[in-house]
């Protein structure tokens, strides 16, 4: 039991450092070619911080553990909104630009409605469903690129540091990707062993520990953004990452190895995935995005409320 736990921790550390280096490399390259910062945050950073979820869910689906593939995607969305974004809001509430959030928020709820529709009707995420989700991902990227195409470059463009060469940035990108792949493999294999040893359903492990572990890059980004006074960037990254969790993470998983919604636990006589996880996902995203869209601000009570929801969600997961 000790070895799987240690390897699980090593996997998490690889994911954290891999995600950190990947984002540094990708952001450095984007800045080198004068790509607007908002586009970097909406695409490159979100893709980079979502890579752990992509790797974990794909490997889980390929190894026949569809519960982890599903639970990691949905669990990461809930974790991103009600823990990571909530922490940043509770610590440092502030104003945001509603216009910059409209596209990711719209895409999220369109994708979430489609995802939930499949879950409630068939419960089976087939290869065609995966391809539709990937098409949504492509559309999201295209819309962001088009929206930012005519955006002015930052007034003060920082010159790349002497030691931050193009080769170094490519190296960070490549090594980060490798660490993410290794970490994801360790996380899935040993997370499954721990779940079996404790008698805990894989879906619960995926919705809590694995989801939290693969969301750590978003947490690192959120803390960094807070430290530099860019809380809105953190919110944009969280929402963008949640879009990717639905359309990219689940899309790749379903395309590579179709999976079904897990039915390990029941709540009120129904599948807990359908009566608990989806409603919580929609609830936390609505609570996170509506004040930002209509009032242009994020308040401390909003962050505290989201944290309370996440705490209750975790307690319920381990008691049903």
Regions found by a protein language model. Name each.
Residues 1-320:
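Hydrophobic alpha-helical segments, chiefly the membrane-spanning helices
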